[in-house]
């Protein structure tokens, strides 16, 4: 089982790239981890629905049947950091394939991606850019791992 964070498109801002790189380096200390930036569709003049369908193809091309797909979605379940750690621990103990957290593009996900998903989580009731959410998600994944291991990172 590998824990993965997938995103649509590259991280643009240097400060976000640096923060993401820090947590991407730290996470493999706890478990097999992969951070994957799926290239966004080339034609940016597409309607939001067509763009979501194009992103869907890119996601499904990489997804295996045994993978657990968890969407980061504003309508998802909210957790405290401790609850999120317990959620990950439970998934790691029960998932045969990879545990994949997916951050969509600026317009969210297609209906087919929602149907394929095994769950949805929200990081907050607030709205964040899909660029910033990457760093927040990586930090929370790292925090969850330290909670699972009983380390002092989380107070």
Swiss-Prot record:
Does the entry feature the keyword Cytoplasm, yes or no? Answer: yes
Q: Which domain of life is it from?
A: Bacteria
What is said about its interaction partners and assembly? Homodimer.
Role according to the record? Specifically methylates the pseudouridine at position 1915 (m3Psi1915) in 23S rRNA.
Q: Which keywords does this chain's UniProt record carry?
A: Cytoplasm, Methyltransferase, rRNA processing, S-adenosyl-L-methionine, Transferase
Annotated Gene Ontology cellular components are: cytoplasm
Q: Name one GO molecular function term.
A: rRNA (pseudouridine-N3-)-methyltransferase activity
Give binding positions for S-adenosyl-L-methionine. Answer: 72, 104, 123-128
The record's section on InterPro entries has: Alpha/beta_knot_MTases, RlmH-like, tRNA_m1G_MTases_N
Protein location = Cytoplasm
Please report the name of this protein according to its UniProt entry: Ribosomal RNA large subunit methyltransferase H
HAMAP family in UniProt: 23SrRNA_methyltr_H
CDD domains in UniProt: RlmH-like
Q: What is this enzyme's catalytic activity, as reactions? A: pseudouridine(1915) in 23S rRNA + S-adenosyl-L-methionine = N(3)-methylpseudouridine(1915) in 23S rRNA + S-adenosyl-L-homocysteine + H(+)
Instruction: Tell me the protein family, please.
Output: Belongs to the RNA methyltransferase RlmH family.
**Pfam families annotated for this entry?**
SPOUT_MTase (PF02590)
């Amino acid at each position: 089982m590998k824990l993965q964070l997938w995103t649509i498109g590259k991280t643009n801002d240097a400060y976000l790239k640096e923060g993401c790189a820090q947590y991407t380096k730290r996470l493999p200390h706890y478990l097999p981890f992969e951070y994957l930036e799926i290239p966004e569709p080339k034609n940016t003049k597409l309607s939001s629905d067509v763009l979501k369908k194009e992103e869907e193809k890119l996601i499904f091309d990489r997804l295996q049947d045994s993978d657990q797909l968890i969407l980061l979605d504003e309508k998802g379940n909210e957790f405290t950091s401790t609850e999120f750690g317990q959620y990950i621990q439970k998934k790691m103990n029960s998932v045969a394939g990879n545990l994949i957290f997916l951050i969509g593009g600026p317009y969210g996900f297609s209906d087919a991606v929602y149907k394929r998903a095994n769950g949805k989580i929200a990081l907050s009731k607030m709205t964040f850019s899909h660029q910033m959410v990457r760093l927040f998600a990586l930090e929370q994944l790292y925090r969850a791992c330290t909670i699972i291991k009983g380390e002092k990172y989380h107070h």
